[in-house]
């Protein structure tokens, strides 16, 4: 069973690597930019391990799902990513809508997950980042989320979603990844090591499998099911030898 699993995973990884190599070759042979679909954190981890030159962007800083762009002179403007604002027609009669509700409504339209980036819910509106070519289809066909009638329009992300969150200070015994995650999310070390064992922890989009991995300044840590934070820096050591660390939770 588990051997089969490992073989299947290796085959899947191999296919993803090939796809990235093709995009890279096409960009440099033909002299134009090429772009992947949206990548989840595991796919980003595979991409990082290929060391191919590329730029990752998901429509705003710190997006979790990103598109890989290949070729020269790449900036955010060139990525084929659009933001759609989905808002209830009548807020006072609307259900309280969650990320899962918006994602479910899009899946019900038959839209593949890889065409969709992050979905951000704010003030009961959903901001959906998607590939440009699927945007008109979403705008024309997405009429309901749960039992709520909605309207869609292309929009920019609200400014406060584009901005970095405020830094917070945490106390930790060291910069080991299990210690820092436990401090950020108020977990026990035991719970944290289970998350690492279950391959749910990534640093800078690479899978981390060791509890004793030491974090460096500006590392971005993703914990499946909990969210992400940037580990900014060590501020000081207390008299009792504990570290005061600065992090930003996304």
Predicted regions located by residue number:
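A common structural junction motif
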Residues: 142-150
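Electropositive, beta-rich accessory/interaction domains or terminal extensions
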Residues: 7-122
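Helix N-cap motif at beta-to-alpha junctions
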Residues: 130-135
